[in-house]
Amino acid sequence: MAKYKRVLLKLSGESLMGEKQYGIDEKRLAEYAAQIKEIHEQGVQIGIVIGGGNIFRGLSGANKGFDRVKGDQMGMLATVINSLALSSALVAAGVKARVLTAVRMEPIGEFYSKWKAIECMENGEIVIMSAGTGNPFFTTDTGSSLRGIEIEADVMLKGTRVDGIYTADPEKDPTATKFHDITYDEVLKRGLKVMDLTATCMCKENNLPIVVFDMDTVGNLKKVITGEEIGTLVHN
């Protein structure tokens, strides 16, 4: 039985690359769609935010000479491409999905509002909220925090390539140990890179817990939803 009624699932753009160096891996996309469909069939209402790092990153663009605002807008468009791809994969898997955009771009997606997102979820659709916050200088992590708070999600599920939060980067430090749960205060005190500071503080102030888990292992999303203790829970 599902532990959560409504969730905000945050996926990184890089995760959609799968084994590729760039762009979207169709196999990975189909795997994600199948996992999302599985929890949707348990009656969970799902809002999704995807990054755009597999296509373009505004901050790295600024380092290469792009105007930061233009670069961030390019990054927003990258998230829309990823959102359309996931929406298409979900529909192909037999699930109703709708793309909402933080910037007006009909007919590519409908303009986002809290009320539209909640109405769609309550009608059994999966809602993919794209284009970040619609403003430059905000990451998609901040966008996902904002949307999670707005849609009154019970939890933010942050699907990553690692199986939780560690004392240090486990890919670089073999002595790093994993937290099973940790408070927001401890995350901030230790300077752990769960999300950027703005996103973390928003979740803390609005009491939105986060579960950081490995989305690339098939079946993990369902385990999180049913309350199995995988990943790391961040809470007040």
From Swiss-Prot:
Keywords: ATP-binding, Cytoplasm, Kinase, Nucleotide-binding, Pyrimidine biosynthesis, Transferase. InterPro entries: AceGlu_kinase-like_sf, Asp/Glu/Uridylate_kinase, Uridylate_kinase, Uridylate_kinase_bac. It is found in: Cytoplasm. Belongs to the UMP kinase family. One of its GO terms (biological process) is UDP biosynthetic process. Homohexamer. UMP binds at G52, D72, T133, G134, N135, P136, F137, F138, T139, T140. Pathway: Pyrimidine metabolism; CTP biosynthesis via de novo pathway; UDP from UMP (UMPK route): step 1/1. ATP binds at K10, L11, S12, G13, G53, R57, T160, Y166, D169. This is Uridylate kinase. Inhibited by UTP. It comes from Bacteroides fragilis (strain ATCC 25285 / DSM 2151 / CCUG 4856 / JCM 11019 / LMG 10263 / NCTC 9343 / Onslow / VPI 2553 / EN-2). SUPFAM superfamilies: Carbamate kinase-like (SSF53633). It catalyses: UMP + ATP = UDP + ADP. Catalyzes the reversible phosphorylation of UMP to UDP. The gene is pyrH. One of its GO terms (molecular function) is UMP kinase activity. NCBIfam families: pyrH_bact (TIGR02075). HAMAP family: PyrH_B. Pfam families: AA_kinase (PF00696). GO terms for cellular component: cytoplasm. Its EC number is 2.7.4.22.
